[in-house]
Amino acid sequence: MSRRVKKLNQLFRADISALLQKEVRDPRLDTLLSVNEVDVSEDMRHATVYVSHLAGDEHKDEILAALNAAAGFFRTEIAKKTDIRYMPVFNFIWDDTIERGVRLNTLIDRVTQHQPED
């Protein structure tokens, strides 16, 4: 991954987070929504935005629908502040790494509790 793409990943993550906090008025997108990572393609035409919600994935489909419906808004607002040749198309994906990590830790705890100590 080039240094430029890494910088754009950081920039887009910060900008989308700020827009979610200050500009977006959709009630499905509350302050518990977290932008975990942005992955811009090497040609800078597409960006995958990984999001999660602190309350879990209960309303995952509604949240993703709202975010993908607002993708053009994010693209337009960020383009106003950014001087890059191509503004990528944003695609929002649910990031379940936190939930998987919690499940993995739970399984590890169960296994270690059932093993006899040496």
From Swiss-Prot:
Its main location: cytoplasm. GO terms for biological process: maturation of SSU-rRNA. It is found in: Cytoplasm. Pfam families: RBFA (PF02033). One of its GO terms (molecular function) is ribosomal small subunit binding. GO terms for cellular component: cytosol. InterPro entries: KH_dom-like_a/b, RbfA, RbfA_dom_sf, Ribosome-bd_factorA_CS. Disulfide bonds: none annotated. Keywords: Cytoplasm, Ribosome biogenesis. One of several proteins that assist in the late maturation steps of the functional core of the 30S ribosomal subunit. Associates with free 30S ribosomal subunits (but not with 30S subunits that are part of 70S ribosomes or polysomes). Required for efficient processing of 16S rRNA. May interact with the 5'-terminal helix region of 16S rRNA. Monomer. Binds 30S ribosomal subunits, but not 50S ribosomal subunits or 70S ribosomes. Belongs to the RbfA family. This is Ribosome-binding factor A. It comes from Dehalococcoides mccartyi (strain ATCC BAA-2266 / KCTC 15142 / 195) (Dehalococcoides ethenogenes (strain 195)). The lineage of its organism: Bacteria, Bacillati, Chloroflexota, Dehalococcoidia, Dehalococcoidales.
